[in-house]
């Protein structure tokens, strides 16, 4: 029985899609532009896997004899957010994008929310969660008004001090928002963000809770779970799929912790899917236009990939990909509409195969089900036949 380890390098796109102009993303090339700005990236394992051999990539080193197969996927869904990218990867193509609110939420949404929770709100803008609680934390404590904010993703986030608005009450507020934000107002996730005051600043607690949406159809994860195999989720995967199709999940502190948790599941689990998201690239560096920090994070992650490879069994398959772009070298702090890389490695697979330019992220999910010999009606065109010996 094969086991697949699927790792999403969140936001590590590799070049603008043909429709990038519609999204204001002409010129975006997250990995290529970071490499150019850094004067080259020391990511030897990704090069060995073939990332520099993908058609059309720029500023990346080619490998004469890559140990992996390589290619890239376009996004069929409308949008460029986390949920849309991950859902398509698992076989769900969205014809209508989930709503994002780069200018904050419209007055009618905020007014309705305020009436329903019986309080005014603070914020209502795009913000970093750690920064906005320190910007507005004192005012929140003084007034009792919760802090509402969003991000480049389709999210409605509500932050409150645990002693001002108890956690259960905050959860009730988020349930109200979840019921409101459907139909033409749909957002992918409503997130409760409790915090406290500690050592001179406001810090988030572990009582975060996501009120997500079920994917609108059967996903790769559902198919795997239905046949009795494990689906182990690392990072925010559990939240993206609203816990559906997942047998066990663990949240993480950062990229390195995410790799540690992935290795832990590899030692514990012997079949099915281990599905990890490494979010630091996007959250800490992409949105903050921190090109140098992004480059360092890529180098750090690359150094850990050999650990994953050395812990793989004979039949294991490793797939490294992304979910969208977030080019820190552009003026925008938003996600970018880009191709995503697909790197595939397994001891029993062919090496050096160019799987080409794929039409949809869903080809990844389709291929995983083929590798696990699971019959399915998932959207996408699998490439198992190209990489199988």
UniProtKB/Swiss-Prot annotation:
> What's a Pfam family in this record?
Metalloenzyme
What Gene Ontology molecular-function terms does this entry list? magnesium ion binding; manganese ion binding; phosphopentomutase activity
Residues that bind Mn(2+) 2: 282, 287, 335
Cofactor binding description: Binds 2 manganese ions.
Q: What class of enzyme is it?
A: isomerase
Which annotated residues bind Mn(2+) 1? 10, 323-324
Superkingdom, according to UniProt? Bacteria
* Pathway stated in the Swiss-Prot or TrEMBL entry: Carbohydrate degradation; 2-deoxy-D-ribose 1-phosphate degradation; D-glyceraldehyde 3-phosphate and acetaldehyde from 2-deoxy-alpha-D-ribose 1-phosphate: step 1/2
Q: Where in the cell is it found?
A: Cytoplasm
Q: Tell me, which GO biological process terms does this entry list?
A: 2-deoxyribose 1-phosphate catabolic process; 5-phosphoribose 1-diphosphate biosynthetic process; metabolic compound salvage; nucleotide metabolic process
Q: Which CDD domains match?
A: PPM
Which keywords has UniProt assigned to this entry?
Answer: Cytoplasm, Isomerase, Manganese, Metal-binding
Against InterPro entries, the record matches this protein to: Alkaline_phosphatase_core_sf, DeoB, Metalloenzyme, Phosphopentomutase_DeoB_cap_sf
Reaction catalysed?
A: 2-deoxy-alpha-D-ribose 1-phosphate = 2-deoxy-D-ribose 5-phosphate; alpha-D-ribose 1-phosphate = D-ribose 5-phosphate
Q: What is its main location?
A: cytoplasm
Which Gene Ontology CC terms are recorded? cytosol
Give its E.C. classification number.
5.4.2.7
Cofactor(s) needed by this chain = Mn(2+)
Give the protein family: Belongs to the phosphopentomutase family.
Q: Return the NCBIfam families for the record.
A: deoB, PRK05362.1
The name this protein goes by in its record: Phosphopentomutase
Query: What gene is it encoded by?
Result: deoB
């Amino acid at each position: 029985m094969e086991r697949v380890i699927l790792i999403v390098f969140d936001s590590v796109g590799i070049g603008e899609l043909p429709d990038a102009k519609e999204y204001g993303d002409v010129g975006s090339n997250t990995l290529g532009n970071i490499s150019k700005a850094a004067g080259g990236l020391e990511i030897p394992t990704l090069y060995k896997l073939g990332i520099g051999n993908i058609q059309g990539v720029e500023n990346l080193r080619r490998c004469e004899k890559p140990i992996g197969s390589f290619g890239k996927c376009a996004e069929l869904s409308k949008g460029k957010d986390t949920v849309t990218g991950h859902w398509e990867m698992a076989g769900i193509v969205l014809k209508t994008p989930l709503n994002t609110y780069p200018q904050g939420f419209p007055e009618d949404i905020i007014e309705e929310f305020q009436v329903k929770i019986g309080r005014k709100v603070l914020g209502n803008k795009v913000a970093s969660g750690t920064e906005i609680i320190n910007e507005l934390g004192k005012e929140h404590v003084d007034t009792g008004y919760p802090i509402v904010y969003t991000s480049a993703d389709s999210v409605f986030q509500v932050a409150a001090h645990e002693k001002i608005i108890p956690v259960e009450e905050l959860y009730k507020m988020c349930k109200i928002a979840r019921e409101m934000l459907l139909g033409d107002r749909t957002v992918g996730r409503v997130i409760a963000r409790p915090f406290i005051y500690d050592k001179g600043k406001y810090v988030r607690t572990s009582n975060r809770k996501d009120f997500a949406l079920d994917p609108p159809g059967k996903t790769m994860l559902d198919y795997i779970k239905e046949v009795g195999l494990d689906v182990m989720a690392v990072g925010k995967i559990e939240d993206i799929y609203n816990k559906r199709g997942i047998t066990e999940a663990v949240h993480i502190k950062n990229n390195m912790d995410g790799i540690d948790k992935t290795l832990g599941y590899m030692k514990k689990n012997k079949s099915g899917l281990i599905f990890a998201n490494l979010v630091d690239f996007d959250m800490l560096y992409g949105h903050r236009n921190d090109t140098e920090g992004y480059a360092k994070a890529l180098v750090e992650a690359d150094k850990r990939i050999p650990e994953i490879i050395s812990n793989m069994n004979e039949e294991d398959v490793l797939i490294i990909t992304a979910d969208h772009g977030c080019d820190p070298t552009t003026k925008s702090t938003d996600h970018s509409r880009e191709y995503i890389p697909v790197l595939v490695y397994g001891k029993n697979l062919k090496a050096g195969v160019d799987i080409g330019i794929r039409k949809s992220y869903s080809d990844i999910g389709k291929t995983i089900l083929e590798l696990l010999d699971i019959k399915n009606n998932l959207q996408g065109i699998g490439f198992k036949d190209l990489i199988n010996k």
